[in-house]
UniProtKB/Swiss-Prot annotation:
Keyword terms, alphabetized: ATP-binding, Carbohydrate metabolism, Kinase, Nucleotide-binding, Transferase
Alphabetized PANTHER family for the sequence: ANHYDRO-N-ACETYLMURAMIC ACID KINASE
One Pfam match: AnmK
Organism expressing this protein natively: Brucella canis (strain ATCC 23365 / NCTC 10854 / RM-666)
Annotated binding of ATP, by residue: 13-20
Name of the protein in its database record: Anhydro-N-acetylmuramic acid kinase
Gene Ontology terms describing biological process: 1,6-anhydro-N-acetyl-beta-muramic acid catabolic process; amino sugar metabolic process; peptidoglycan turnover
Record has ATP-binding as a keyword: yes
Amino acid sequence: MPDLKRAIGLMSGTSMDGIDIALLATDGENWIERRASASMDYSDGFRARLKAGLVDARAIKDRAERPGLLRQLEHDLTLLHAVAVHDFLHEQGLQPHEIDVIGFHGQTVLHRPNESLTVQIGDGALLARETGIPVVYDMRAEDMRHGGQGAPLIPAYHAALAANLPLGLKGPVVFVNIGGISNLTYVGEDGALIAYDSGPGNMLIDQWMELHGHGRFDPGGATAMSGSVDRNTAHRYLEHEFFKGNHRRSLDRGDFAIPAKGELNLADGARTLAFVSAAAILKSASHLPARPRTYVVSGGGRKNGALMDELTALAEREGAHVIDADNAGFDGDAMEAEAWAYLAVRSLCGLPLTYPSTTGCDKPVSGGVPVRP
């Protein structure tokens, strides 16, 4: 039996809807025992503060700066994560001393890889004090110091999961995470590992629904299912410079914008943006060394029926199969949080978190800042 560490992963993604929490036991390599998971939604008021913080973050020139609302926001965000951990431990009947480490992502408020600048607010030392558990945080910065894009970081976890795929799933396999921004991880039959952001995920759909006063997202894709794709608008998105050339890069929330309010009706806009999110995945996958045979989809976007219908139809044209991560034996809601738990253990072991083929860094790079209570 390998030396297993119990780790909690905490993820607050680009959708800014709340905190995902996951527990696993792992050696930081191929032994993974997935345990419980949960989520905690942010209040509407706190979500509004996060969005206001994105505006203040535009002024950041040095990643240690916290202009405007950001310093207090960082403190309050960290305390919310501490509450989430305490509640989770109580629900699971666990004590802090039974957890070896927390992997703490924080909230990305600025990501400019071309300037080697990425900022995730979240005070790891405060979280360690509040929970009584060691914390590893700030896992993207070291990758950038070595010429990487600082994203995506989940591929190391995907590679471990790929070793335990259900029988019958044909490779090459691509893991797709559809959060606010989508990313993909290609696991070749020869073990090749390639990853990059693939385009907008739920982000544009969510913003479109909010613009029209119809909530924070399109539940189940119901609005999109009643609309039609506007091909001219979709074409405009898919001709974005992000998709051109073979050089892949990571994305920030500001790289794509929604259509003007009067440009499309609500349903057609939602359907068009769902199509764009799906087509972006296939368009980005065209840069891979071999055509994928299976797409394993996680993240909130897999619950949008219109997006999944579009993705399935596009993949089938290329002879590929699309499967919800839940139906492949994984937890599609908790996968990113699980990854952060796994990466925290890898960090403690000095193992790489990123690779030249996943972020463009100059060598395999570990990372993260460890702090004790």
